[in-house]
């Protein structure tokens, strides 16, 4: 199981309490996915239903759970988080390959990394792409991905 630190658990509990509308330390089943997403996870609705034990749709706004029952569900979702494959990342970057030659503009990849998804700082991006740009300012994204994914 993916164990959380004491600080993480405290942060998760604080976020959980923000969704507790009645102040009884519980949230509705229907809020479970929202809380997980607020905590940086991205479970599908099917994954949320699975960790909740596949409740009927009419139970979603009736059944409640407390933090002690929510935390193991969050751990399950975090542990099963799809990290994506090399091919997934290549496909994602191929969208930016306007010439179809396996390269993307360095400026464009920088922009994507600092503005979309799990945003990186400009310093992190510079460290990542350092030495990968050719004389035209292009980056071979397959080569970059191999370097990133292989450490």
From Swiss-Prot:
**What positions are modified (N-acetylcysteine)?**
2
A Gene Ontology molecular-function term?
cytoskeletal motor activity
Point out residues bearing the modification N6-acetyllysine.
81
Kindly list the positions at which Phosphoserine occurs in this protein: 57
Q: Which SMART domains has this protein been placed in?
A: EFh
| GO BP annotation list | muscle contraction; muscle filament sliding; skeletal muscle tissue development
Respond yes or no to whether keyword Transcription regulation is given for this record: no
Name the keywords, alphabetized.
Answer: Acetylation, Motor protein, Muscle protein, Myosin, Phosphoprotein, Repeat
EF-hand domain location is: 7-42, 84-119, 119-151
The cellular component terms of Gene Ontology attached to this UniProt record, alphabetical and capped at eight, are: brush border; myosin complex; unconventional myosin complex
What job does this protein perform?
Regulatory light chain of myosin. Does not bind calcium.
Q: How does it assemble?
A: Myosin is a hexamer of 2 heavy chains and 4 light chains. Interacts with SPATA6.
Name the chain's protein: Myosin light polypeptide 6
Provide the species name.
Rattus norvegicus
């Amino acid at each position: 199981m993916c164990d959380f630190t004491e600080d993480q658990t405290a942060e998760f509990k604080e976020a959980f309490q923000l969704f507790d509308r009645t102040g009884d330390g519980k949230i509705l089943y229907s809020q479970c996915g929202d809380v997980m997403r607020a905590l940086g996870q991205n479970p599908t609705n099917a994954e949320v239903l699975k960790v909740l034990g596949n409740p009927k749709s009419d139970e979603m706004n009736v059944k409640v759970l407390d933090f002690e029952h929510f935390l193991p569900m969050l751990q399950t979702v975090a542990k099963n988080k799809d990290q994506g494959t090399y091919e997934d990342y290549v496909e994602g970057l191929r969208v930016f390959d306007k010439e179809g030659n396996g390269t993307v503009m360095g400026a464009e990849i920088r922009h994507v990394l600092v503005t979309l998804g799990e945003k990186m700082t400009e310093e992190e991006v510079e460290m990542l792409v350092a030495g990968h740009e050719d004389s035209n300012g292009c980056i071979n994204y397959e080569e970059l991905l191999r370097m990133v994914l292989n450490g």
